[in-house]
UniProtKB/Swiss-Prot annotation:
Annotated residues for binding of NADP(+): 60, 84, 104, 131, 162, 210, 214
Null allele phenotype: Reduces the production of PR-toxin and leads to a large increase in mycophenolic acid production.
EC number(s) recorded for this UniProt protein: 1.1.99.-
UniProt keyword Magnesium present: no
Residues annotated as the enzyme's active site: 184 (proton donor), 210 (proton acceptor), 214 (lowers pka of active site tyr)
SUPFAM superfamilies documented for this protein: NAD(P)-binding Rossmann-fold domains (SSF51735)
Family named by the database record: Belongs to the short-chain dehydrogenases/reductases (SDR) family.
Coiled-coil spans in chain: none
Species of origin: Penicillium roqueforti (strain FM164)
Stated name of the protein: Short-chain dehydrogenase/reductase prx1
Amino acid sequence: MANPLISNHIGKHGKYTQAFLEQNGPGDARPTALDILKDNDRIDNMKDKVFLLTGSSGGIGIETGRALAATGGKVYLGVRDLEKGKQALAEILEPGRVELLELDVGSMESVRTAAKTFLSKSTQLNVLVNNAGIMACPEAKTVDGFESQLAINYLGHFLLYKLLEQTLLSSSTPEFQSRVVNVSSAGHHMSSVVLDNINLEGEYEPWKAYGNAKTACIWMTNEIEHRYGSKGLHGLSLMPGGIATSLQRHVDPETLKEWGSSEFAQKYAKSSAQGAATTITAALGKEWEGKGGVYLEDCQEAGPVPEGGTLAVGVAPHAFDPEGEKKLWDLSLKMLNLSE
């Protein structure tokens, strides 16, 4: 039976329409990342393309990396800990084609070093997938003095993108234009970007900080589309879905118990491979060739929150704010001491 909270929200998924309407928990009929690859004829069919993924060694990162590797292209898997990365990704690593890149997006020095290392190995980058993240953690500052959720979910990725921007632009071709994909979250509903106090000094609350950072991820890709879409570089953001991963490690146990006990959550939840499907749709879906400035969920563009629905689905009105997006871009450049 279709879930009434989401049935009015679901659009056309083609062969998966019924699967998304009749959700039945992890491993149900909803597509995996590899299913999306097959549907788009991307299996072993992109040998001339280069991909870079952050947050590769845990959660949906492993499955996203597995799918990118299955394209036959060159894949750089960003990991904070090389030893952990070797263990987690052993099945897909392939010397000279699928390799690790030491990268901690919570450290701007690490981001700069990783970008320099990448550029010493490749003059090409077709898709950048910013997947690394943390959620609802206690207040903390990074080594650079930034609020940790902002730095890890957004600011480190913005810096990485800026350092690779010209490579993304020069790698774009008429048959496959370059893409930047930011993994956001339904958590963006929790807050717009607090532009006048982006580090939330004196007003920190874990979920507000998460919303602040995840909306920033959406704004970033919207602004990429505004600035560079006409030049063959596109930005897309997405909600992967409800997936049980270490991302939830800071969430109060009682809250987790409450989430897990609801029938909606049990049926809405996805496996990591299913969660990575929307990321791969954004990164490689043919329907998004030459397009961007959108927020996806369940492998399609998200609509507004349905009447009577939950914050688990749909996109908040504040996710699209051209004036705010420009201000955030300029503020981010200033925070990182970058010029345009």
